[in-house]
Amino acid sequence: MAQANSRSRNSATISYPEKRRARVNLGKREVEILKTPYLLETQIESYRKFLQKDIAAEKREDNGLHAAFKSVFPITSYSGYAVLEYVGYSLGGESTLFDVEECKLRGLTYAAPLKVNMRLVIYDKEAPAGKKAIKDIKEQEVYMGEIPLMTETGSLVINGTERVVVSQLHRSPGVFFEHDKGKTHSSGKLLYSARVIPYRGSWLDFEFDPKDCLFVRIDRRRKLPATVILRALGYDTEQILDMFYKTNHFHLNQETVTLDLIPQRLRGELAVVEIKDKKGKVIVEANRRISARHIRLIEKAEINKLELPDDYLYGKVIGKTIIDKETGEIIAHANEEITAELLKNLRATKTASLDTLYINEIECGLYVSDTLRLDTTTNQLEALVEIYRIMRPGEPPTKEAAESLFENLFFSPERYSLSAVGRMKFNRRVGRKELTGLDVLSKEDIVDVLRVLVDIRDGKGDVDDIDHLGNRRIRSVGEMAENQFRVGLVRVERAVKDRLSLADVENLMPQDLVNAKPVSAAIKEFFGSSQLSQFMDQNNPLSEITHKRRVSALGPGGLTRERAGFEVRDVHVTHYGRVCPIETPEGPNIGLINSLAVFARANEYGFLETPYRKVVDRVVTDETEYLSAIEEGDYYIAQANTNVDEKGRLVDDLISCRYKGEFTLTTPDKINYMDVSPRQIVSVAAALIPFLEHDDANRALMGSNMQRQAVPTIRPETPLVGTGMERTVAVDSGVTVIAKRSGVIDSVDASRIVVRVDRKETEDDDDIGVDIYNLTKFTRSNQNTCINQHPIVEVGDKVQKGDVLADGPSTDIGELALGQNLLVAFMPWNGYNFEDSILISERLVEEDRFTTIHIQEFTCVARDTKLGPEEITSDIPNVGESALAKLDESGIVHIGAEVNAGDILVGKVTPKGETQLTPEEKLLRAIFGEKASDVKDTSLRVTPGITGTVIGVRIFTREGVKKDERTLEIEKAELSKVEKDLNDELRVREDALFENLEKLLTGRVAAGGPNKLAKGTKITKSYLADLPRQKWFEIRLQDDAATKRLEASHEHFKELRETRDAKLKDSRQKLTQGGDLAPGVIKIVKVYLAVKRRIQPGDKMAGRHGNKGVISTIVPIEDMPYLEDGTPVDIVLNPLGVPSRMNIGQVLETHLGWATKGLGKKIGEMIEKGADAKELRKSLKPIYDLSKTQRFDLEALEDPEIVTLAKNLRKGVPISSPVFDGATEEEIKQLLKMADLPTSGQAALYDGRTGKKFDRSVTVGYMYMLKLNHLVDDKMHARSTGSYSLVTQQPLGGKAQFGGQRFGEMEVWALEAYGAAYTLQEMLTVKSDDVAGRTRMYKNIVDGDHRMDAGMPESFNVLVKEIRSLAIDIGLEND
């Protein structure tokens, strides 16, 4: 499907929906170089790589399931004589028992069984040493649980609900250098640190302390001097110093020392002695600071030796250990400071020279040397023991344990992995050329990290920015599932190792070794309950798409809301074109959950990249290149709206561009790239807001979030003012039906479309070329909204591959349609639009403009209880006849019944324990023998506040339980429907087959056949018409090739019938077999109610610009303000909502909407006057000519198509004003002029109640308004009595618990302030938790006695108990 979508957009032909209603594009840029990519690619592609389902086992790449298996297998026994190897895997083919729809109905997971081919190799124990002889090899397919499959639209069905796994934005593995911003130490000194983050394994941190010593932490444990880890790696003091320092070489004379001079190293030092050239001329006086000029002079004079006094050496550090050559004893250790004493010793032992560390305050500090002095360890073993003590405190260290622990921490592939990404980032950061290498750390890696850290402390190099998108990567579904799978496999590995070491391993098969439970449990847990596996937002097509394109920084291995600071949440320069700066939730998650930008995608390493057009020598080419945030920094990148001449040359002298994350101006010859599109920086939802460029960012954020909450209306209406993204979203979301192949519509009804495919599209002769599309009718979505598809094509219409055949929820002729176009006036109206309230006309209710259908699902479960089974029946104790009127004999409500709150949907009785019966009851039971008293009524009733129509009932019965009448009736109806569908399908396919046969046979010479067909006769149509179609296959032809084709058709005919029978059998089996229900469940009944909700006061509405409000009242049409021609407005908004919010886009949209409506009206008038196609074409041309670029080709349409187009434009000519490239003020004025409307955008309005003209003209026009899924029906709630909390005996809270209203602390103060003592007492006792008092009160009200006497509130008893629990005896004194 993905391919179908992406390809269809590239076709040059005009699509079917566009012919029906084309948008006038007011964008300024030439045709898009890059079409919008398939919007669900991230999810689908990632999961495809994980499964590699249709790729042969040998050809599978090293990722996904394959990689997980390869990383854990082969598993070798402890002895090494048995090995379990992985060969390959296969996923159960298309024969998965239930398809997506059935899984949703039955509450199952849509998955395929995973079968893994494993090989057990057993080696001969008796073989001579050093030679391994294979004794036995067994290969077997092992079942390893089920792997969920992805639906075509990128979601997963888990336990019957559609879920989406959101991609995670996490810190890329690699090495990062940062400082604490001076917050750790009171002096404000910057403390630098480095952190090596692996993909999995222990973290390694290096850090400076305020005294400039280096420390290391492993997994954030207690810190150790950093040189401990270097010693553990096997380096000694001298080697460590050698790695980090250069040395100065001194020769010892009797009284002085001579330095082998490297002039550069003197820079910045004080000259201790005069420095003279060979002629004795003083170059540097004593006690002068040596500057760069002095150094040049010294170099010029070629001075390479310098005699210095002894005290120059004092305090310097020895670089190499000095040994007495005669005795072999150590005189001075490396890293020892030189003192007068030491110099004396050196001279005494006739040491000729020594090396000191070259230290310079500016560029080379003493950090490592100082750290070595702190380090108490002296050799490798001591260092290893020290690390062992930190990692395993309290355990006695042994040499072996310490060595294996350190080895396992960073150098073992099982425990530690940087991954390819981590290695690439690591090598790049420490300045290596090659980007590949081992996944584990090496000695050199650790040394390099320390070296870079020391360099940064010395002022060479910068710290990293962790919010840069080059340091954060995307982890999508496939990768996360793979990690979970690996976790499961590692658990299996331990068990397999133990079993392989058993004595009788020779008699075992791979199946006996591997237990699939841990693997399937890990996968189940991930898809079922991971923080990133979310219940899909299915409000409308946009919310689905956005949910699948979401990127979250939360979740396992990510951030937590509490810890995330401002920096992480902020918009970063690298977000440009990768992550949307606008769309993010308001509230605690702001900035942590983002949306992918329209063109963004993840590269092989998981870094986000965005496309740019290449610019070569000032000329913009059509070549596009994807750049990641890392690569982008080095280039000059121009904006998408930069001025370009016809040949693509950059025109301006100075061009605004981005370079290294800054906006700057530069000359055209420096430009390397240019943006592909102005909407490149925003997400799909933000790209749907016209005039986004005129809105304040905060309101745009609300606008993009609120579009996702729009409820699909009964009759969707596409926006008059759109952005051109509407079609893309409707097609890619998967809610519409898309033609898989081109053809002609053969038949259409409400639930099925049949397309006769063009001959050239059919793959082979066997393919008769019929595509059948079944539509989804009135199904419940995750958000209880209604999913319903209806065809937009008619019989005989030609359709191209990728065209929209049927609209889904919130789509109108293949375009996204979230709301309705309303005539809006910005004016106050009697205070009814105070503070963002909205005033609407009764016309919207009458015309059902915002009526929505919501489908509720009610479930009734009959279980086995200790006292006996629950029963679903219409025989319910103590329930009147009227309450049972809507139930059938089985106790289940009829389809089509109108039900209200409290009505019984499914009658159910539960056995209750035997109770002592009163004599009267005993007598009754003796007479009537009824069991009325030993069961209680636990029927499923309609919850309060819901009224609706029953539209469906599903019954699932446990295997082996007798089915009731209703179940059999439903099964029979379902089966006959399936049978009818299959027969229809067969008929259509057979008709096509015989049509092809007729073409084949007509005019051919026969060699004999039924009805006395003589040899040599030509076959005619009339002969075929008289012959029953079955007998056509008995005709014999003289042409061999034709005979072969006839035989092939006969085979195909038989095949069609067999397929039908097989499908029917399969369906019958699926319908009649008992469901796989949870333990203890006998029967489940699901009842679906359709609730029609009209718009009413209290509902929330919004425009697309963050202009939201609640309906305050609905005014009769005749009272609404009206225009001069008598048109009453639909909705009145408060003008004060615009200036302070700075979302001016809504005003521009209103003006442009009015103009488009006016143009539509003019076209409508022409049609009414009976204009023909020629006249219509003439009047449409100037409108479509407004498009500067991407002009719609009217000439390509035939006359009937022009008429259809014009008819569809009567409601208004839809216009697209792309984001950041939209219509200008001049164009809006021009359009208003064309529509004969005032160019001010304001008109005189008249008061509907008095008929008087308002004092000044008002801004009127058409705005697109949405009804949001915050409906007053779902929020209204009232309670008289209900359930109480167990401990406090106070009423519960919230609508879901049918709770009361909280009377809190402040409300108590209010009553106290008014002195309303009795009211207060009532609130705190009988209306709350005085148990006896409230029962008495209830009785009093029934008796008509309205007195109240308050008793002891239960909360007082709770308080007494609380105090007693503190061992303070407290009790009430009874007087």
From Swiss-Prot:
Keywords assigned: DNA-directed RNA polymerase, Nucleotidyltransferase, Transcription, Transferase
Record-linked PROSITE patterns: RNA_POL_BETA
Enzyme Commission (EC) number: 2.7.7.6
Gene Ontology CC entries for this record: DNA-directed RNA polymerase complex
Reaction(s) catalysed (UniProt annotation): RNA(n) + a ribonucleoside 5'-triphosphate = RNA(n+1) + diphosphate
GO aspect biological process, one term: DNA-templated transcription
InterPro entries to which the protein is assigned, alphabetical: DNA-dir_RNA_pol_bsu_ext_1_sf, DNA-dir_RNA_pol_bsu_external_1, DNA-dir_RNA_pol_su2, DNA-dir_RNAP_su2_dom, DNA-dir_RNAP_su2_hyb_sf, RNA_pol_bsu_bac, RNA_pol_bsu_CS, RNA_pol_bsu_protrusion
Disulfide-bonded cysteines: none
Enzyme class: transferase
Primary role: DNA-dependent RNA polymerase catalyzes the transcription of DNA into RNA using the four ribonucleoside triphosphates as substrates.
Subunit structure: The RNAP catalytic core consists of 2 alpha, 1 beta, 1 beta' and 1 omega subunit. When a sigma factor is associated with the core the holoenzyme is formed, which can initiate transcription.
Stored PANTHER family: DNA-DIRECTED RNA POLYMERASE I SUBUNIT 2
Family affiliation: Belongs to the RNA polymerase beta chain family.
HAMAP family: RNApol_bact_RpoB (MF_01321)
Protein name in UniProt: DNA-directed RNA polymerase subunit beta
Organism in which the protein naturally occurs: Coxiella burnetii (strain Dugway 5J108-111)
Lineage: Bacteria, Pseudomonadati, Pseudomonadota, Gammaproteobacteria, Legionellales
Name of the gene this protein is made from: rpoB
